């Protein structure tokens, strides 16, 4: 099974680690200049450094979709500088996870893969994706899978 994850920041990396440990081949996409803050726990660092290791799991930068596919065949997580996730058209993944956390949909469509899961606000399950996940830390619905409504944007006092 091949899964493409849009985003390679800390939340996307956590998702990737879980899927990788379940034996799933992974390609992550991010910006050419990643904006991750917690860089030591982000696979996005592979774009800057060529490769990185998080919790003992290796990820390596790929420059093309074909190179990414070859890396996944070797059991290595591939990370592409591909913010629009154009690689999806070439890789034909079994599932797509949007974990960009941009608070709005930046181009993920329910037709991008047989299974499309979106993490964070800005997505409507059944319209943009098959299921949406509410990621707000500390909220009782954290990690809740939503299949029929929109994820909410919450404002927290500073």
Report residues per predicted region.
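Well-ordered secondary-structure scaffolds
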Residues: 1-158
């Amino acid at each position: 099974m091949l899964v493409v994850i849009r985003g390679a920041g800390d939340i996307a990396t956590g998702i990737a680690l879980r899927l990788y440990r379940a034996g799933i081949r992974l390609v992550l996409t991010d910006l050419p200049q990643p904006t991750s803050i917690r860089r030591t726990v982000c696979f996005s660092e592979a774009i800057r450094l060529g490769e990185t290791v998080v919790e003992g799991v290796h990820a390596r930068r790929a420059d093309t979709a074909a190179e990414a596919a070859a890396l996944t065949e070797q059991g290595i997580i591939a990370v592409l500088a591909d913010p629009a996730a154009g690689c999806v058209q070439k890789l034909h993944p079994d599932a797509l996870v949007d974990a960009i956390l941009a608070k709005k949909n930046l181009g993920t469509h329910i037709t991008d893969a047989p299974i499309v899961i979106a993490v964070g606000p800005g997505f409507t399950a059944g319209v943009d994706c098959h299921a949406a996940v509410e990621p707000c830390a500390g909220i009782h619905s954290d990690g809740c899978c939503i299949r029929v409504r929109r994820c909410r944007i919450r404002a927290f006092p500073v």
